[in-house]
């Protein structure tokens, strides 16, 4: 049984005694920074000149420096920029400001696992990864709760990296819910696999195919949308609360029987073999190489695939239906139907 680490197991004073620079002020960046500050930690934000996030960080009371100046000032540098930008950011603004005794913190192990970032000797390298989006991390913290967190140490130059990592995890509220020890390799490979095979890629493709099947059979697109996309949240919420068993306990006998006899017809053993191939590409570094090369070239494949997804008819159907939803919640900075950030 995996040991779970809680607030009582970590010493908050360790991170309170450090100067922390959070590089990036997006979803995770704002949550880490605000939660750490509320936990009594001295925090500055590192952002490039002209960053659209600068005004927001300043409005929320933070001192904003360039990434280079923030890294030079800090004892703990938290790199929360997008994966594809971390390598350049590190080389241009962070690496030369790392001295013995400092700590690098990541919320995802991509750049360490695949060798895009290598820390100099004498620098601790740790991972503190909340298992939820930044807005949830912040909201749960403010409510006196937390989002579970996984923690890893890649380099323990000081001999105290684990203690500081758990202290940081406590500072952002993760140990209120519980923390699990992992490795950079395990976190990176399982996170990418979950996103690609199940949570994002697998689910998106399954929903689109279900929608297409009903439309091609002559059913109304609005009805198809409700059946294969809208109701998905209701089922996933039940699974989140109590696993697949609670989901099956909550549905009708007809739905449960259909689950057993038709699920394996749709998600056949061949799908599992395809999943293994996806995992192999992740483990070998092939996916990372393809992603970074495309990003370095201006992201032509990425942008083409994004555009194709936005043009799928399920999106236009959904936009019209969501206007009718009294319970619909929209983020202030989101344009309905657009993936661009």
UniProtKB/Swiss-Prot annotation:
GO terms for molecular function: ketol-acid reductoisomerase activity; magnesium ion binding; NADP binding. Its cofactor is Mg(2+). GO terms for cellular component: cytosol. Its EC number is 1.1.1.86. Binds 2 magnesium ions per subunit. NADP(+) binds at residues 25-28, 48, 51, 53, 83-86, 134. The active site is at 108. It catalyses: (2R)-2,3-dihydroxy-3-methylbutanoate + NADP(+) = (2S)-2-acetolactate + NADPH + H(+); (2R,3R)-2,3-dihydroxy-3-methylpentanoate + NADP(+) = (S)-2-ethyl-2-hydroxy-3-oxobutanoate + NADPH + H(+). Mg(2+) 2 binds at residues 191, 227, 231. Residues 2-182 form the KARI N-terminal Rossmann domain. GO terms for biological process: isoleucine biosynthetic process; L-valine biosynthetic process. It is an enzyme of class 1 (oxidoreductase). Pfam families: KARI_C (PF01450), KARI_N (PF07991). Involved in the biosynthesis of branched-chain amino acids (BCAA). Catalyzes an alkyl-migration followed by a ketol-acid reduction of (S)-2-acetolactate (S2AL) to yield (R)-2,3-dihydroxy-isovalerate. In the isomerase reaction, S2AL is rearranged via a Mg-dependent methyl migration to produce 3-hydroxy-3-methyl-2-ketobutyrate (HMKB). In the reductase reaction, this 2-ketoacid undergoes a metal-dependent reduction by NADPH to yield (R)-2,3-dihydroxy-isovalerate. HAMAP family: IlvC. This is Ketol-acid reductoisomerase (NADP(+)). It comes from Clavibacter sepedonicus. The gene is ilvC.
């Amino acid at each position: 049984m995996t040991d779970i680490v809680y607030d009582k197991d970590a010493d908050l004073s360790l991170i309170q005694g450090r100067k922390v620079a959070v590089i990036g002020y997006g979803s995770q960046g704002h949550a880490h920074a605000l939660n750490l500050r509320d936990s009594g930690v001295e925090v500055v934000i590192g952002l490039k000149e002209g960053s659209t996030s600068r005004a927001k960080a300043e409005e929320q009371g933070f001192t904003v420096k360039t990434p280079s100046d923030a890294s030079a000032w800090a004892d703990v540098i938290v790199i929360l920029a997008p994966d594809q930008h971390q390598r350049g950011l590190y080389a241009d603004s962070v690496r030369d400001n790392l001295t013995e005794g400092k700590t690098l913190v990541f919320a995802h192990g991509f750049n360490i696992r695949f060798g895009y970032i290598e820390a100099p000797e004498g620098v601790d390298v740790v991972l503190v990864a909340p298992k939820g989006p930044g807005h949830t991390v912040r909201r749960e913290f403010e409510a006196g709760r937390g989002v579970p967190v996984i923690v890893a140490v890649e380099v323990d130059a000081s001999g105290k990296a684990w203690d500081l990592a758990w202290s940081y995890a406590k500072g952002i509220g993760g140990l209120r819910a519980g923390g699990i020890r992992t490795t950079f390799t395990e976190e990176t490979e399982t996170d990418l696999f979950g996103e690609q095979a199940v949570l994002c890629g697998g689910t998106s493709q399954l929903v689109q195919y279900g929608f297409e099947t009903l439309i091609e059979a002559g059913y109304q697109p609005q009805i198809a949308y409700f059946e294969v996309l809208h109701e998905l949240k209701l089922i996933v919420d039940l699974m989140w609360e109590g696993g697949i068993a609670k989901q099956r306990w909550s549905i009708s006998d007809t739905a449960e029987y259909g689950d057993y006899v038709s699920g394996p017809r749709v998600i056949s053993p061949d799908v599992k073999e395809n999943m293994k191939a996806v995992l192999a590409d992740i483990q070998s570094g092939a996916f990372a190489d393809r992603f970074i090369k495309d990003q370095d070239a201006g992201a032509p494949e990425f942008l083409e695939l994004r555009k194709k997804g936005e043009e799928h008819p399920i999106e236009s159907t959904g936009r019209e239906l969501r206007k009718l939803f009294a319970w619909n919640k929209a983020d202030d900075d989101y344009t309905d139907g657009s993936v661009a950030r």
